Amino acid sequence: MTKTLHARPSAATDTTFAPPVITGTATEDALEILFHALLDVARRHDPELEDVLHGRADISSFTPEMLARALQVQGIWFQLVSIAEQNAAMRRRRHVERDQGREALNGSFAKVLAEASARGIGPQQIHALLKDLRIRPTITAHPTEGKRVTVLEKLRRIYLVLRELELPRWTERERNGLMNELRDQIELIWMTGELHLEKATVEREVAWGLHFFDETLFEMLPEMLLSLEESLAQYYPDETFEVPPFFQFGSWIGGDRDGNPYVTASVTRETLQRNALASLRRYRDGITHLGRVLSITERSLPVPETFRSELAHMLAESGDARAIANRNPGEAYRQFLSCVLRKLEATIARNKGARSVGPDYPSADGLINDLRTLEKGLADAKCGALATDIVRPVRRMVEIFRFSTVRLDLRENSTRTTKTLHALWKLRNGDREPPALDSPAWKDWLLTELARPRTPETSFEDFADRLPDDARETLATFALVGEMRDTLDREAFGAFILSMTRSTVDVLGAYLLAKEAGIFLDTTGTEICPLPIVPLFETIDDLRAAPAIMKELLGIPVVRRSTRWQGGVQEVMIGYSDSNKDGGFIASNWELYKAQVRLTTLGNHLGVPIAFFHGRGGSVSRGGVPTHRGIAAQPPGSIQGRFRITEQGEVVSFKYANRGTAAYQMELLAASVFEHALLSEGNGNGSRAEFDDALEALSGASRAAYVNLLQAEGLVDYFQAASPLDEISLLNIGSRPARRFGAKSLSDLRAIPWVFAWSQNRHVITGWYGVGSGLKSFIDVRGEAGEALLRRLFRDCRVFRLVLDEVEKTLLMVDLEIARDYAGLVEDAGIRARIFGMIEAEYALTREMVLRVSGDSELAQRFPQFSERLRGRLPTINQVSREQVELLRRYRSETDEDKREAVKSALLLSINCIAVGFGATG
């Protein structure tokens, strides 16, 4: 039964915001509480907005200032709705686990291992998987996150208060106190403001990323490993498993130089130090807590001799044994922890650049060993439960996060690395012009330099001052790797990502820069690069070339030696964003799939496993799909327990802002990798010759239609006029410019603003354009047999089913009437008619063909939760979109600076509101 709160008036459909409709699902109570709390705040600060929230106000007559306030309150409401939905999802998962057992919970280790055990998968396969398991979600700032850290903190508090309000134990007075706190937090968000008043800095982005570790990840990731251990014990009770710290986080924040001039070597150094301090301070808190709770006296529990011996060594090393013993007489475990704490404090001081005042921990390994000693000391004293429940979580935390919190990747564009190599060439060849990049002479020079022994006379420091600033900066960043690995933590760095890799020489060039910067190691007379060099293949042409490039690369001795030293696995990154921008949705997904199949086959042939790093964004257009289904649709054999993925912007906030959601999302990711490795690796689904042939044909036809639009005369002019493309940069939500190298061409526009702007103007072409033409062409050529084959693909081929499902969801976000309003901003009538006409026709065709293949009568029939959630938000999003069209028109034409500034504030809030409403930006 549906319950409607604040029913929307039937009149004024296009000029009022829709009030919330509460559907009687698990979100009902939370939504009602939040709506009334927001109403109370509105009445207190801006009574006119009460009518806006009730859907009674005609906003078309609002001044820009009043419209800005209305948009702000609506944006706050969308964020509160998201909190209520997360809260309800958490409650549903608890109910399932309580009523049916954990194995009934989708995305849980218990469900995967229950099925594995039932299928007869033995413990040896589990042991082998645990040995190879490597999962690393990698946080990127990328300009897609509109929430400020201070707002994130308040939203988290609202989430926690909602959880408290679920409990029946409160008196009326206590419940009123919680309600007051809820209103206070909403009021603080109201007064804080949603917009960044200044351009984001890398330093602020680093703080944003670390916020999620402080709030949730430091605590919840060890809990996730415990969940796996419990499930293994339940379904393989006769086997003992050692669960390694296989799940770690990576980061690009402070290391991603691609197109961001603000990420310098000094910024990267500061980032590494801040990352280290975040983990060290957390460990200090953990050790301090252990010292408080482990109040065990020798009178009540004899201390094992082996532990007493370790304590004596620690006390002697501290140089202050008497003071420590006198402070905690007869409390051996507290004395031990006092020694640990002193070493940790000295490590923190060293990290800050202060002179060490005593022994410290050169690396995380020392702290891990000391915590193991403490665990063993408790276990030997018959306090194994205390060791497991109290000490082990802290030790697990250190094993996972070490002294770096995250493994920081460095990323640079191949254009920049090539410029640096050219500078080196000229330095050593009397300013002669270097050979062409595709010439044998250039490759020969790279190989010769890589083979040349490095001597003190050729050290980077000796010739740095003769290089251009850009080249010196690039080499300084590489040099930082050696410095920080020696002084901070050997796992402080992840890899060097070479974006826009187009050839073998691009990658060899990165190896040479690493050598020139002095980070190569000499092992038994042969040099290796300790930093993994990871090629990033982004465009469709580059994805097609990837197998040949990697085959040649892995045949080069220095590359092969380095890969072997790094663990024997070669990582390859594949980009979803640029391949989509390059060729459209079907072509991008199919080329990514084929590249993985071919690279996996190549790696198996060469005896060098290929591990894939998936460069996905938050939106469907940039690879954002449901975690479980996205992993299940990867080619058989392509994961093998190794999985990396980027987590960007609003995706990070959604997944990791709250502990319950973070725990679920991390287990979902890890369990999905488990499932693919244990239950799907031998599944040839979707790779049969008939299916491959069909997908190849669909890819070609859909890409042709998509490229036809990209090449249509006037598309760039249309896009800039009919979307807030240029205005998005005013949001100040990222430190990185929207365009690489300051160019103004479509090809150089970053994929994020490309997707962001098309979603704002309700065309959303990046998630569907060309699909209808591809499907129609296939049926036109192959007739009834072709249509039947498409239906079999839809039923049996995971990758095709995933693509079509996501296209269908995207089509629900499109509104052609609103899109037509945006098109009205294009002054050239010919361009407007031509481009919008193409989009309108392709939309109708895509909708028709998707329904024809799926057999459904309406879009998203198979996704009732998704469609219900979206349809509940669309009336308000639609009205904000209509207002945005007028705001764009006024902002672009207004000449009075004060009036233009007022319009700008409302315009930026409209962009933010639409993004929050849809739950995605770029």
Curated annotation (Swiss-Prot):
InterPro entries linked to this entry: PEP_COase, PEP_COase_bac/pln-type, PEPCASE_His_AS, Pyrv/PenolPyrv_kinase-like_dom
GO cellular component, one term: cytosol
Cofactor(s) the protein requires to work: Mg(2+)
EC number(s) given by UniProt: 4.1.1.31
EC top class named in words: lyase
Catalysed reaction equations from the record: oxaloacetate + phosphate = phosphoenolpyruvate + hydrogencarbonate
Keyword DNA damage: no
KW Magnesium (keyword) present: yes
Superkingdom, natural source: Bacteria
Gene Ontology molecular function: magnesium ion binding; phosphoenolpyruvate carboxylase activity
Residues annotated as catalytic: 142, 581
Summary of the function given for this chain in its UniProt record: Forms oxaloacetate, a four-carbon dicarboxylic acid source for the tricarboxylic acid cycle.
Protein family membership: Belongs to the PEPCase type 1 family.
PANTHER family the record matches: PHOSPHOENOLPYRUVATE CARBOXYLASE (PTHR30523:SF32)
Protein name: Phosphoenolpyruvate carboxylase
Origin organism lineage: Bacteria, Pseudomonadati, Pseudomonadota, Alphaproteobacteria, Hyphomicrobiales
